[in-house]
Amino acid sequence: MLKVFSNPTQIVTVNTSGKNYKRGKEHNDIGLLSGYSLVVEDDIIKDFIPNTSVKNYETDEIIDVKDKIILPGLIDCHTHTAFAGTRSDEFRDRLKGKTYEEIAKTGGGINKTVAAVRRASTEELINTISPRIDYFISQGVTSLEIKSGYGLDFENEVKMLKVISFLNSNYEIDIIPTFLGAHTFPPEARDNHRAYIDLIENDMLLYIAHNDLAKFCDGFCEATAFSLTELEEIFRKAKSHGLAIKIHTDQFRNLGGIDLALNLKAASADHLEVVDDEDIKKLGNSEIACVLLPGTSFFLNVPYAPARKLIDNNAILALSTDYNPGSSNISNINLIMSIAALKMKMTIEETISAFTINAAKALMISEDKGSIEIGKKADLAIFNTNDYADIVYNVGRNMNYMTVKNGNVIYIAD
């Protein structure tokens, strides 16, 4: 079936000429087209035609997007959307001066959410998570990564991943599952790390890989979570089962996580708030996507990752919400883009590249997603404005008018 999305003011293609990611100065090249309409055949981007040619073009459907702009479907590549309960009490405590780490050391933090997820039934989790996914879709998201990591035992990690799998089967967008059993040690393993690591390696990973429940294995390299040695062991086991690697690293301390990511050829290194100059240079010479999470810095009131240094050193930079109940209770992508521009000195164009093609790179899906290029999937976000700059300029405002997945309109704003 042929469709024409006709008469947009702009098409922001984020064209990569087949490279499928952007690094360094390339982030600013977003492939802007004016005066063209977009032709989609079934689920594939087929062509760009002059607006003046639309009336004579043989097509099955014309979708008028006059006075609007077309972007690639947005991609949120690092989220903890599958959670239950609330941590609003901890938010109050932080406003009174407690740090995120202090709260975690006294039994709060991640383990509070673990308790809530363990209590929740599968049905309760599905009903809780679904409206969050609906909101992402309403913003123009067509691919969404969701991590486990709030079960922290065999039964509940598997429960989380099966819920994520169910949601992926029942939503039009792609929901990419990540196993985050190495998020932190559960209370019952606080004094017996070896037993929990063995559980991850011998039981969880084996079952998850056999049942195809996750694409990635992630882990949190931090003093309050897993050591470098512990994560390396887990990651090597995960790779032996066919899972790709992601790592939470350099959020509060630099413990050597970047070298581990490089050695294991990780898909992405995420957080990087305290990454040092030496590691920035290494990342700039690598194929690893650097996933920055400015919502976390905003929410915790801590320093931001050095986006400018990373870009100036030729790194591949992606952005994500890090949506979670404790350190970034923010699922508003427009807000994250604005924070990245205002606080990390990124250009508007850089934030767009970071939430499209490079976010796709972080999820290893950039060969057919993340940019509007002939032959790629027709995943689109169509915004109700004449200028792409408005998306970042209008802080926190959802300007998405239409979300298109695989050529099909799945959301239209009221």
Where do the language-model regions lie?
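N-terminal metal-binding scaffold of metallo-dependent hydrolase/deaminase domains
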Residues: M1-N56, Y388-D390
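Conserved beta-strand scaffold positions in the cores of enzyme catalytic domains, especially
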Residues: V4, T59-D64, P177, T403
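C-terminal cap of metal-dependent C-N hydrolases
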Residues: K22-H27, F355-I357, K377-D414
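Metal-associated gating/positioning segment near the N- to mid-region
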Residues: K68-T128
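Metal-coordinating catalytic core of metallo-dependent amide/deamination hydrolases
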Residues: T113-T128, D134, T142-L255
